[in-house]
Amino acid sequence: TGGGLAWGGGCSPSLTPELVMFTDNADPVKLLALDMKTGEIVASLPVLDDLPEGYQVAVENSAIVYDDSEGTVSTIVCNWFGAGNAGLADPNNDSSIQSYANIYDQNWLMKGNCMIAPGVERVDTIKTDSGYEMKSIWSRNDLSDTSILKLSTATGYIYGYVQDLESGMWQYIILDFATGETVFTMDVSNKYGYNNMAIGMYAGNSGNALYCPTGYLE
């Protein structure tokens, strides 16, 4: 798509006992399921392909993958287009040479997630008698998240760190894994420095705490 941080796909592969899951960088971007033993593509599906006109897609993080051990593998794919400016659209630009200044550019730092294209989608890969098939379960075209979403199978919730674009408020957000609906938000701050700048959120070892690094000191 020419809008990511490199010409290839940026989605690190995630593994199940039978499959390797990742997205490509085609147009449209597709989720791929490869056979773990042979490398054969056993299923694929365009993802994040129903965004409003003008938005592009680049997946630059590892997708959430959950295997329920009953024949269904659920994958959560998140759009990162706009998270940094690698200049891939410029034919004279050498995309192999990057710097702090263009990956963490000032527009993104100051303006926040209005610079990030929206899109979060859940796709299920289902094992059938004849192989595998993929289907979209839900999609959210109103969320921009670069915190590397976290899934808790104990609660059935997906946890993230987003910005309300109307108020500028940075928030922790909880989504229902089954439906994709927002079930809870908690305000953090509307100061620009609370932008996580694609630094991944993580959970504490107690299982009851979430942490998302930002660039703000106070």
What do the PLM-derived regions correspond to, one by one?
Residues 6-12, 52-66, 142-151, 192-203:
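Repeated scaffold domains used in trafficking and secretory/extracellular systems
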Residues 46-49, 189, 216:
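A generic structural motif
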Residues 6-51:
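Acidic, glycine-rich loop-and-beta core segments that form the ion-binding/anion-interacting portion
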Residues 40, 179-181, 208:
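Residue-level signal for well-ordered, solvent-exposed loop/turn and beta-edge residues enriched
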Residues 18-24, 29, 61-191:
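Loop/turn-rich, solvent-exposed surfaces of beta-rich toroidal or solenoidal domains
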Residues 195-218:
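Blade-level signature of beta-propeller repeat domains, shared across WD40, Kelch, NHL, RCC1
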